[in-house]
Amino acid sequence: MAVPARHTSKAKKNKRRTHYKLTAPSVQFDETTGDYSRSHRVSLKGYYKGRKIAKAASAE
């Protein structure tokens, strides 16, 4: 059975984990509605690529 020859220190372990991070969602400005929305998704007002394709979401 494979066993590590040396103990992995806390610093070495934590340096390996520095690449795990959150990425910001891609947000684009919609000129039709004047709002920001995520790309490739319908805006809250029902627009996608400048065209109305769905009813606006109502606040209940």
From Swiss-Prot:
The keyword Ribonucleoprotein applies. Pfam families: Ribosomal_L32p. GO terms for molecular function: structural constituent of ribosome. SUPFAM superfamilies: Zn-binding ribosomal proteins. It comes from the Bacteria. Transmembrane segments: none annotated. Residues 7-20 have a biased composition (Basic residues). Residues 1-21 are annotated as: Disordered. InterPro entries: Ribosomal_bL32, Ribosomal_bL32_bact, Ribosomal_zn-bd. NCBIfam families: rpmF_bact. Belongs to the bacterial ribosomal protein bL32 family. This is Large ribosomal subunit protein bL32. It comes from Streptococcus thermophilus (strain ATCC BAA-250 / LMG 18311).
